[in-house]
Regions:
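Hydrophobic, glycine- and aromatic-enriched re-entrant/interface helices and adjoining loop segments
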Residues: 15-16, 28
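Alpha-helical transmembrane-segment detector that highlights a single hydrophobic TM helix
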Residues: 17-23
């Protein structure tokens, strides 16, 4: 998104001459340009990648809620227009899916084949459930912190 922002040169709401005095912003204005939202792109890339890796419904829901709350916070804080966040989210989904496919290709090409015993301690994709709970706990705490 750092490449896209100066190329598109769309002002953030806090820099838009028609809106800048109508928006109450909490902190500094950040950079001058806001299209696309880097926060939305990054969080949706992480959410997409982790959802594809873990293949666990509850984790996917939590990740999407987490990324959506971060995206909404950018609009609420007045640093992005809704379209900035939406396009950032779409970019993030594309990047997350691409990185997953790349990781899957590299893993299939260069990883040693090993047989993993599957039990109730593992998810369908082979991850320890305890690791999933750590991820879910971190997401929940981040979400609570964001909302408070």
């Amino acid at each position: 998104s750092s490449i896209i922002k100066p190329w598109v040169a769309r002002l953030r709401p806090t820099y838009d001459p028609e809106l800048m005095f109508q928006i109450r912003h909490i902190s500094g204005r950040a950079g001058q340009y806001g299209f696309v939202s880097s926060h939305a792109a990054n969080t949706f890339a992480v959410a997409t990648f982790m959802s594809l890796v873990f293949k666990h419904r509850l984790t996917t829901i939590c990740l999407l809620v987490w990324a959506s709350v971060i995206g909404y916070s950018r609009i609420y804080l007045g640093v992005h227009f809704p379209l900035d966040v939406l396009c950032g989210a779409m970019l993030g989904v594309l990047v997350g899916a691409f990185v997953y496919m790349l990781q899957h290709f590299v893993h299939a090409k260069f990883a040693f084949s090993h047989q993993q015993s599957f039990s109730s301690a593992y998810t369908r994709s082979g991850f320890l459930r305890d690791d999933m709970y750590i991820v879910l706990t971190a997401l929940a705490l981040t979400l609570v912190y964001t909302l408070v």
